[in-house]
Curated annotation (Swiss-Prot):
GO terms for molecular function: ATP binding; metal ion binding; protein folding chaperone; protein-folding chaperone binding; unfolded protein binding. Keywords: Chaperone, Cytoplasm. Together with the chaperonin GroEL, plays an essential role in assisting protein folding. The GroEL-GroES system forms a nano-cage that allows encapsulation of the non-native substrate proteins and provides a physical environment optimized to promote and accelerate protein folding. GroES binds to the apical surface of the GroEL ring, thereby capping the opening of the GroEL channel. It is found in: Cytoplasm. InterPro entries: Chaperonin_GroES, Chaperonin_GroES_sf, Chaprnonin_Cpn10_CS, GroES-like_sf. One of its GO terms (biological process) is chaperone cofactor-dependent protein refolding. GO terms for cellular component: cytoplasm. This is Co-chaperonin GroES.
Length: 98
């Protein structure tokens, strides 16, 4: 995992997509043009948390290194240090894989 020079703010996280298999269970090879973008990723940076109504900082549940699932249209695609990454709010994350 490369060290990125970017720190997300508030309740945002930076995610690196985890590529899916190139083959189906039956052995059919899926070409890149037919693949959907993966909805699974690894958290590589997290913000400090959002402020609640009382001004208290609420820390994020996800941590750097967590493997997560997120919605198909979640996040904003960015390029940081030449790497394609996603920046999304923690609320866009559906869950942490065990």
């Amino acid at each position: 995992m490369a060290n990125i020079q970017f720190r997300p703010l508030h309740d945002r996280v930076v995610v690196r997509r985890v590529e899916s298999e190139n083959k189906t269970a039956g052995g059919i090879i899926i070409p890149d043009t037919a693949k959907e973008k993966p909805q699974e990723g690894e958290v590589i940076a997290v913000g400090n948390g959002a402020l609640d109504d009382n001004g208290k900082r609420v820390p994020l549940e996800v941590k750097t290194g967590d493997r997560i699932l997120f919605g198909k249209w979640s996040g904003t695609e960015v390029k940081i240090n030449g790497e394609d990454l996603l920046i999304m709010k923690e609320s866009d994350i559906m869950g942490i894989m065990g």
